[in-house]
């Protein structure tokens, strides 16, 4: 069995039409400086004979200006480069109808964001926030966005590189894929719970578990893919479904809102709806007294 963790470039080859990937080119735009954000792989490919923007992280690359950015970590420059790729995609298709806008495919295999001192001083949050905003704007502009988890989908890096997608797919747990906020050692520090207790909880509680099966239960993944060679057909299927739903005005069933409802249907997020209803009630009560 082929483990895809750390092989983002190979995943691109397995998913897109043969020899169609043109790195650092989107529409009429190109990324000239290869030394900026070397851990971010962006470009255009064909998938099912349609143009598609590809955004991935390169686990083999290292950013020499930011020593903590390696092994697929999304750093300051990588976040901005990925955001720029999305905006170039929007610009390239701005005159096209919604049903003709190219899909954006996110290949997800990242252990997190760049946690270095330089990144925090310069504003790592601005970089990741810019990328999240770009994807949200592309989604609203009509671009189908599919995230394909092939390895690690962890912490703030997955927040910006994946969770804004219309649909999230993942290779199943037999490929050693990991989806979680942080390792249990970090959870232990924050919650003050013993690591032994957290390890027990992680076996049954999707909040603490790292596998894609638990995230599927929460509605965070629309579909688990059981074979590497099945990624392409699954992605094409979801692109077609996204186009149909957007054309029918059913955007609310896609993206973060759609996954929230999906988690409730699967029995993994049963309190979400009740909490949202309580918050709405309190907000409108406050608004009626103070805002209107």
UniProtKB/Swiss-Prot annotation:
It catalyses: N(6)-biotinyl-L-lysyl-[protein] + malonyl-[ACP] = N(6)-carboxybiotinyl-L-lysyl-[protein] + acetyl-[ACP]. Its EC number is 2.1.3.10. Its main location: cytoplasm. Coiled coil: none annotated. One of its GO terms (biological process) is carbohydrate metabolic process. GO terms for cellular component: cytoplasm. Gamma subunit of the biotin-dependent malonate decarboxylase multienzyme complex (EC 7.2.4.4). The two subunits MADC and MADD are required for the transfer of the malonate carboxy group from the acyl-carrier protein (ACP) to the prosthetic group of the biotin carrier MADF. Required for the regeneration of ACP. The keyword Phosphoprotein does not apply. SUPFAM superfamilies: ClpP/crotonase (SSF52096). Residues 1-281 form the CoA carboxyltransferase C-terminal domain. This is Malonyl-S-ACP:biotin-protein carboxyltransferase MADD. It is found in: Cytoplasm. It comes from Malonomonas rubra. InterPro entries: ClpP/crotonase-like_dom_sf, COA_CT_C, Malonate_gamma. Gene3D superfamilies: 2-enoyl-CoA Hydratase, Chain A, domain 1 (3.90.226.10). It comes from the Bacteria.
């Amino acid at each position: 069995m082929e483990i895809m963790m750390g092989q983002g470039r190979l995943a691109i080859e397995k998913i897109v039409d043969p020899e169609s990937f043109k790195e650092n080119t989107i529409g009429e735009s190109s990324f000239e400086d290869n030394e900026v954000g070397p851990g971010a792989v962006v470009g255009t490919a064909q998938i099912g004979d349609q143009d598609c923007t590809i955004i991935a992280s390169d686990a083999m690359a290292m950013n020499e200006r930011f020593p903590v950015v390696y092994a697929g970590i999304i750093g300051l420059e990588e976040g901005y480069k990925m955001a720029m790729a999305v905006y170039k995609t929007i610009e390239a298709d701005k005159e096209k109808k919604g049903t003709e806008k190219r899909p954006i495919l996110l290949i997800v295999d990242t252990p997190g964001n760049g946690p270095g001192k330089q990144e925090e001083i310069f504003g790592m949050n601005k970089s990741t926030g810019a990328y999240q905003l770009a994807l949200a704007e592309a989604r609203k502009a009509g671009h189908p966005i599919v995230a394909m988890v092939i390895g690690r989908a962890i912490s703030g890096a997955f927040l910006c590189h994946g969770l804004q997608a219309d649909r999230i797919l993942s290779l199943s747990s037999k490929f050693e894929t990991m989806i979680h906020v942080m390792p249990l050692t970090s959870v232990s520090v924050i919650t003050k719970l013993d690591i032994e207790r957290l390890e027990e909880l992680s076996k049954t509680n999707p909040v603490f578990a790292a596998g894609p099966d638990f995230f599927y239960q929460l509605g965070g993944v629309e579909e688990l893919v059981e074979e590497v060679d099945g990624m392409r057909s699954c992605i094409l299927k979801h692109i077609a479904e996204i186009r149909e739903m957007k054309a029918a005005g059913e955007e609310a069933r896609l993206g973060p809102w759609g996954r929230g409802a999906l988690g409730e249907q699967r029995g993994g997020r049963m309190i979400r709806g009740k909490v949202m209803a309580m918050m709405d009630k309190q907000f409108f009560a406050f608004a009626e007294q103070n805002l209107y």
